[in-house]
UniProtKB/Swiss-Prot annotation:
Substrate-recognition component of the SCF (SKP1-CUL1-F-box protein)-type E3 ubiquitin ligase complex. Residues 71-252 form the FBA domain. Expressed in brain, liver, pancreas and adipose tissue (at protein level). Widely expressed. The keyword tRNA-binding does not apply. Residues 3-50 form the F-box domain. Disulfide bonds: none annotated. One of its GO terms (cellular component) is SCF ubiquitin ligase complex. Part of a SCF (SKP1-cullin-F-box) protein ligase complex. Interacts with SKP1 and CUL1. GO terms for biological process: proteasomal protein catabolic process. This is F-box only protein 44. The lineage of its organism: Eukaryota, Metazoa, Chordata, Craniata, Vertebrata. Keywords: Ubl conjugation pathway. PROSITE patterns: FBA, FBOX.
Length: 255
């Protein structure tokens, strides 16, 4: 039987069509069309199936989800928000706030270091010198796709990670500071652990530091990430801590 109006189609057929439409078009173009489309597009079933279709969840997913629509968008946006975290582009995207001693430098991970590092995609690192070296990056959340209502109402978890290591022949100090900032760049949350002091003749293994911001105040618009350090023997050259594979991610943990 011919259908003269798309709304004469059974609701399950309409739902099947909506599943294959990009999410932003669903909300901006389809949802305002009529109350029937609005109600169908708001169904939990639709967004759960879109999550499954995109590989955001598995068939046996059993974790509670408060809002599948928000979950879908958070998962679709989820990526490392720090640019050039592993020095593949030199110092592109980084601000060299303090550039002491012989200044920041980029070095290659040696073959042995690559075997030890948990991510085989990492090939380079940043290294500090005999006077303090600090570099930073500011993440503009709106520019990265995280709209204001999402950040203020949902306030998704913000996870920060960094990797650092000393040289075996020289002591060093590593430091990290991450701040959640308002539109006026006022701090709304800070993670600043005590500096890590590494003694000379350490095992020089890579260590990870991580922190998750949860239940922070509304108004977060930027994230400021700064790390670096100094060697504690003041040797000319690049004997301070090495850093690489830094990351800032927003949203639920990956399955």
């Amino acid at each position: 039987m011919a259908v003269g109006n798309i709304n004469e189609l059974p609701e399950n057929i309409l739902l099947e069509l909506f599943i294959h439409i990009p999410a932003r078009q669903l909300l901006l173009r389809c949802r305002p069309v009529c109350s029937l489309w609005r109600d169908l597009i708001d169904l939990v079933t639709l967004w759960k199936r879109k999550c499954l279709q995109e590989g955001f969840i598995t068939e046996d997913w059993d974790q509670p989800v408060a809002d599948w629509k928000i979950f879908y968008f958070l998962r679709s946006l989820q990526r490392n928000l720090l640019h050039n975290p592993c020095a593949e582009e030199g110092f592109e995207f980084w601000s060299l706030d303090v550039n002491g001693g012989d200044e920041w430098k980029v070095e290659d991970l040696s073959k042995d270091q690559r075997k030890e590092f948990p991510n085989d995609q990492v090939k380079k690192y940043f290294v500090t010198s005999y006077y303090t070296c600090l570099k930073s990056q500011v993440v503009d959340l709106k520019a990265e796709g995280y709209w204001e209502e999402l950040m203020d109402t949902t306030r998704p978890d913000i996870e920060v990670k960094d990797w650092f290591a000393a040289r075996p022949d020289c002591g060093s100090k590593y430091q990290l500071c991450v701040q959640l900032l308002s539109s006026a760049h006022a701090p709304l949350g800070t993670f600043q652990p005590d500096p890590v002091m590494i003694q000379q003749k350490s095992d020089a293994k890579w260590s990870e530091v991580s922190h998750t911001f949860s239940n922070y105040p509304p108004g977060v618009r930027y994230i400021w990430f700064q790390h670096g350090g100094v060697d504690t023997h003041y040797w000319a050259g690049w004997y301070g801590p090495r850093v690489t594979n830094s990351s800032i991610t927003i949203g639920p943990p990956l399955p």
